[in-house]
Amino acid sequence: MTSQLITRLLPINSTTSPSIYETIRQYDDDSGHSDTEERAAMAVDEENLDGAYQDYELEGALAQASDTQSTHSSFQSPAAGDSHLPRHPKWTQESVNEAEHDDEVPASLLVEGDGEEDPLPPPPRPPSNRNRILDDAPAAEFCSPRLRGQWEAAEEHQTPHLAPQPSPPLNLHSNRRAGLAFANPKEKAMWRWANVENLDNFLKDVYIYFIGNGIWCIVLSRMLNILTLAFVVGFTTFLTNCVDYRKVPHSKTLNQIIVPKCTNKMSASSTFFLWLFTVFWFGKVFQYIIDFRRLRHMHDFYLYLLDVPDSDIQTISWQEVVGRLMALRDANPATAGTVSTKHRKYIGSQSKQRMDAHDIANRLMRKENYLIALFNKEILDLTLPIPFLRNRQLFSRTLEWNLNLCILDYVFNEQGQLRPLFLKATHRRALSEGLRRRFIFAGVMNIFIAPFIVAYFLMHYFFRYFNEYQKNPSKIGSRQYTPLAEWKFREFNELWHLFERRIHMSYESANMYINQFPKDKTVQLSRFVAFIAGALLSVLALASVIDPELFLGFEITHDRTVLFYIGLFGTVYAVARGVVPDDAQVFDPEHALLDVTAYTHYKPAHWQGKLHSDDVRKEFATLYQLKVVIFLEEILSMIFTPFVLWFSLPKCSDRLIDFFREFTVHVDGLGYVCSFAVFDFKKGTNLMPPEPQHHRPRGLKHGLHDLRGDYFSAKDGKMLASYYGFLDHYAPPARPSGPHASQRQNYPQQPVPGPTHRAQPGANHLHSSRIDRWDNGQHSTMRQSALRTSRFGAITGVGGHASPMASMLLDPHHQPSMSGFRSKAHPTAASRYRPSRQAHPMADTIQDVDEDQLPGINIQPSNVTTTSSGGPATDDSQIEESWRINLAEDANSGEDDEAEDVEKVAGGGGVLGLIHQFQKVTNEGRGAVGM
């Protein structure tokens, strides 16, 4: 209901063209018949789908086909024929004829005939004294003439027998449901799993149940949330309406200042909103009670099908849950056995065969991936339309909620699928105008809602943090990442709990970086204030210890006792002391920021060479704000959000519509997803190192090609960082050797840096020199090993050893291929998802060169080999910065450098070098190396 609020409230101008919402609804209804991409592209295992038909469903389908054909004309149009039982599913229409000779039963005997255009003729009417089964028998097209003749011959030699007419499929289905009431919980859970119709919503429930730590933790959390809501509103009402503050100075008990029957004396507006809140509160309670049944079903799914009890759900990893989901999929591959015609329209995007770690992440983050891309491409205009704040961006949880309501609920339908109408350029203007109206309408709604939300959050923040700040004043200076920073740092297909873990690990490094910069004037003033406040506090504390009964009641100023000043000076001392940095801290802001980016994976190109500057610190400080400042910005955003919705966001409505059309791809069995979220594992996401500038053809045409490539690629290496981050979460934890070892990084396993870590000058020097070599754009050559693909999809070498990149949580078509990491001398194939997209640059490996190495010695790339024993042979320190993409281009390299790179890829050394390598490989018993 919330997702359709703006759609239903916006007026429709009947005097002009039809509303875009009417067009969207009509196109959604007709998309199952008109979307040629859905019909052609969705390819799912035909046998699994046909295997879902049961006997009673086949009988019901035949009966319905006979009834329908007897009442309709044989000259029915093809469009009307679609209203009958579905024929071949959309993803099997092309593969039926190819696989017909392999089936035991020919396609002519199946319910779903081959004819896509011609309707079925009415069945022949048998004599009345014949078997009743023949009345419901299929037409001649449902069986071959030979089988039909055998059937009639058998009927002539046997006594007619009136068999009971099969019940309608609805009654049989109802009886099957009634039988589930007496089944055991495991059978019930299996039946629900087999009849899942919307896999996106089901997997979302599975993930919410996982991060909620089980049924009882979720129930307790919901109860405490509604009780907290009731307490904040009730206590605020009591403080504002039931206390006579004029009597406080002259009263000694609470009863003297309480207003009797205060609710009867409340204003009409306060009474109305209190009743409105009461209705909302009881509605939430009723919703939670109704939702308990769904939680119970999810509890049974985890317990009986995944074998994960509530006692283990807090300790089991999500990767283990994904593995058990894949095992359950392999054990029960069929989709829902009985689905309606309406649901079969989009069943191609609900295939349970497409359910490995990559597909599950794409389903769970179908909408979030688009938001991540929007922030990465900087398409959203979030600047404040105020003269003195035009360069400042405003983004808060309130604005995030409005973006979901205005954009995502506009682009996606009720089933969570992207509306196909947004992929048509013909409706661009109407869709853009509809989005513009949604922004304006949401701004108007925020004006009426903002006062109540501001009051609630102010009271909630006051009740929650005042006592904490009063006891520990140093926490006033604590920081956290802003909502805008979270969307900039989050990667494609990165689930929330994995992202939250990665970001939490960066807090210590971020605090160290903020405290690194010289603030000598502030530090000197803070030390002076801390000294004065500490001296006064020590004297008062010592006097109160000597004679507490006399001195604690002593008034230093009018009505201000010693106890008051002890608390005041203690607070001032704590705040001033918190500003002064630790004396043992080592000053190295560049190294500290590199430690932060190792976790956040965020390092814009304009930061290059400026990590020590104050400009970079100011930019990072806007992403890592004080908690108090974030709260104040959240409150102020409720006031300024309508202006952003009215003036800033409508300017980018055209770009938003173009974005969803140009960055959406269709994946078989998965549906429409963001193009950046589809990782091409076989080609290493097509990420290749860029060519030097002087090797590129010059001219206007190539300049336009570069602009197009930049437009269709992610900024700041987001695509490659997401790819490696995904492999780190779902690939084996052991780091492989060879080319991939220098490209991947196990982010959560990095040690948290500290003062002891920085105090090692040797490690610091090696770390800095390695980063310098990386940032200077030195390309290291990589040897492409002779690889072959096993029948299970894992990449194996010539010796038969499995690829270290293979993962049990990825299907064979998603297994990463080491052959995808090629040298820049080899051309890369275009992506099958968007042929026009330019290949992304691949991150360069970090080449560690010994300091005592002579400059004249040429080390062949064949020395950096992939160990066949499976043990890691790569320095772990190389992985520390491997997630970055080197976007800089070396403009000083010449033709000799390119020739040298090609020679290195080929193995170097000419014919003698090749003979030497062949002898070496033969002696060591390995496959071809460096060929």
Swiss-Prot record:
Keyword vocabulary terms for this entry: Autophagy, Cytoplasmic vesicle, Endoplasmic reticulum, Golgi apparatus, Lipid transport, Membrane, Phosphoprotein, Transmembrane, Transmembrane helix, Transport
Lumenal side: 236-271, 549-560
InterPro entries named in the record: Autophagy-rel_prot_9
Cellular component GO terms, alphabetical: autophagosome; cytoplasmic vesicle membrane; endoplasmic reticulum membrane; Golgi membrane; phagophore assembly site membrane
PTMs per UniProt: Phosphorylated by ATG1. ATG1 phosphorylation is required for preautophagosome elongation.
Transmembrane segments: 215-235, 272-292, 528-548, 561-581
Compositionally skewed regions (Polar residues) per UniProt: 65-77, 740-749, 859-871
Record carries keyword Transferase: no
Main location per the UniProt record: membrane
Bilayer topology annotation: Multi-pass membrane protein
Intramembrane segment ranges: 439-459, 628-648
Localization, UniProt: Preautophagosomal structure membrane; Cytoplasmic vesicle membrane; Golgi apparatus membrane; Endoplasmic reticulum membrane
Spans within the Cytoplasmic topological domain: 1-214, 293-438, 460-527, 582-627, 649-931
Catalysed conversion reaction: a 1,2-diacyl-sn-glycero-3-phosphocholine(in) = a 1,2-diacyl-sn-glycero-3-phosphocholine(out); a 1,2-diacyl-sn-glycero-3-phospho-L-serine(in) = a 1,2-diacyl-sn-glycero-3-phospho-L-serine(out); a 1,2-diacyl-sn-glycero-3-phosphoethanolamine(in) = a 1,2-diacyl-sn-glycero-3-phosphoethanolamine(out); a 1,2-diacyl-sn-glycero-3-phospho-(1D-myo-inositol-3-phosphate)(in) = a 1,2-diacyl-sn-glycero-3-phospho-(1D-myo-inositol-3-phosphate)(out)
GO biological process: autophagy of mitochondrion; lipid transport; piecemeal microautophagy of the nucleus; protein localization to phagophore assembly site; reticulophagy
Region called Disordered, residue ranges: 62-133, 734-780, 816-840, 854-879
Homology family: Belongs to the ATG9 family.
Domain remark from Swiss-Prot or TrEMBL: Forms a homotrimer with a solvated central pore, which is connected laterally to the cytosol through the cavity within each protomer. Acts as a lipid scramblase that uses its central pore to function: the central pore opens laterally to accommodate lipid headgroups, thereby enabling lipid flipping and redistribution of lipids added to the outer leaflet of ATG9-containing vesicles, thereby enabling growth into autophagosomes.
Subunit structure, interactors included: Homotrimer; forms a homotrimer with a central pore that forms a path between the two membrane leaflets.
Classification via PANTHER family: APG9 AUTOPHAGY 9, AUTOPHAGY-RELATED PROTEIN 9
Function of the protein: Phospholipid scramblase involved in autophagy and cytoplasm to vacuole transport (Cvt) vesicle formation. Cycles between the preautophagosomal structure/phagophore assembly site (PAS) and the cytoplasmic vesicle pool and supplies membrane for the growing autophagosome. Lipid scramblase activity plays a key role in preautophagosomal structure/phagophore assembly by distributing the phospholipids that arrive through ATG2 from the cytoplasmic to the luminal leaflet of the bilayer, thereby driving autophagosomal membrane expansion. Required for mitophagy.
Designated name of the protein: Autophagy-related protein 9
Organism this protein belongs to: Coccidioides immitis (strain RS)
